[in-house]
């Protein structure tokens, strides 16, 4: 607000909040937009009052800022904030308990409320569960429809109609209650004239016929049907009293009363006799039932005694068996304990006897048998020498057997066989050698590689050097002719190679650098003559094309002989090292 100081003119204070509230109310009720409040313009340069001629008094402005009123204390807000803070602290404590063992021990020891369920929720809840819950809540919130402006207007109109109806009903009930509460004196003169005329009743004494009444000794034992009959007769008498001739029927009423009393006495006597008969029959039936009950009780008692005796006998039997088992087990335990005690005594006696004997022997050893220790040491050394000498003899014998077996196997495989001799299998030689060399790994490995090479061979199947040389000499012409074949030779090529191979001049001597077929054949023959089978096999294996294919069988046989020779030489060398 603005206030002018130093002048007699005061500006009106305009409350914007109140004007806004009034304008909003006008808009809601009349649906018309109210104009803004008038604005008062104040000129700051010109004073509102004409100043005196001596000194002009300046106008100072002071802006007063109104302080906002302090909020009142809200109990609901305090409780809500406290609950929210406590829930956050409690949830944080339980979450820290899942990560820290000390906090978990504190929670478990103090038995915080619902800590097990909340810990289970915290440990088992994942990020996916929270996302699913958020999506579900979001979907439910999206399904909620907020009321539109038309719905709000309809609701307000309904509330207005209901309020009017409620006021009408309240006024109606209030007027009815006031009309009922009025007394006759409070009525108006017109209402008093409209009231009906009241007539006063006049009573007089009239003689009536006597009613039927039962005597006191019969009244308590009369049946209800008789009482109903008497009541109906009394009603009939009262109806007669209403007629003008009631006095002439008094004798009739008395006679009816006498007959009803007699009837009541007879009924009472019949009832008494019936009750006595019923009592007698009840006593008789009670006696019969008591006798039957007694008989049944005796039967049940006898049956229970029989069952009791049977159960008792069975329990006694089981108890006796159990006692026998326990006695037997105790007897066995006692006998075993006694046996163990006797055994311990014997062991102790044996130990003491051995100790005594050892002491006596030590005394004798220190006395008469002083040199017995030296003799024992010499005997021990002699035993060691005998054992080592025996091992040496065994190894020497094994070595001799292995060398003999290897020599026999080598002679059978590599020696030149006689023409008239029959071929023999190599398997017995291998079995003998395998039985002898069971403790040497090198011999076992060599025999393991040698067995598949010669298991299917005989003494005549391994070719000698001379046989290999003769076979190669027979193979040489084919090698010469195949060396002259073109890459894709036909019949004419084979015939021409066969003819031209006859024209080739054989090479004498060894040419180390020669790569032609004649030089290779010459080197192979020279190596075979000198006994260098490995060099000859290497030269033949280096051949290419048709010449290599023709020489393949010869190379296989030569390699087999080389492998057998190598393995036999290895076995022989290893046997010498044993």
UniProtKB/Swiss-Prot annotation:
Where is it localised? Answer: Mitochondrion inner membrane
Q: What is its main location?
A: mitochondrion
Q: Where is the transit peptide?
A: 1-29
Region described as Disordered: spans on this chain: 174-193
Q: Which UniProt keywords apply?
A: Coiled coil, Membrane, Mitochondrion, Mitochondrion inner membrane, Transit peptide, Transmembrane, Transmembrane helix
Entry GO CC: MICOS complex
What's an example Gene Ontology biological process for this entry? Answer: cristae formation
> What InterPro entries does the entry give?
MIC60
Q: Where are the transmembrane segments?
A: 75-97
What ranges are annotated Mitochondrial intermembrane (topological domains)? 98-578
Q: Which residues lie on this side of the membrane: Mitochondrial matrix?
A: 30-74
**Membrane topology classification:** Single-pass membrane protein
| UniProt feature coiled coil, ranges | 294-392
Listed under subunit, the entry gives: Component of the mitochondrial contact site and cristae organizing system (MICOS) complex.
What is the role of the protein in this entry?
Answer: Component of the MICOS complex, a large protein complex of the mitochondrial inner membrane that plays crucial roles in the maintenance of crista junctions, inner membrane architecture, and formation of contact sites to the outer membrane. Plays a role in keeping cristae membranes connected to the inner boundary membrane. Also promotes protein import via the mitochondrial intermembrane space assembly (MIA) pathway.
Please state which protein family the record places this protein in: Belongs to the MICOS complex subunit Mic60 family.
**Protein name per Swiss-Prot or TrEMBL:** MICOS complex subunit MIC60
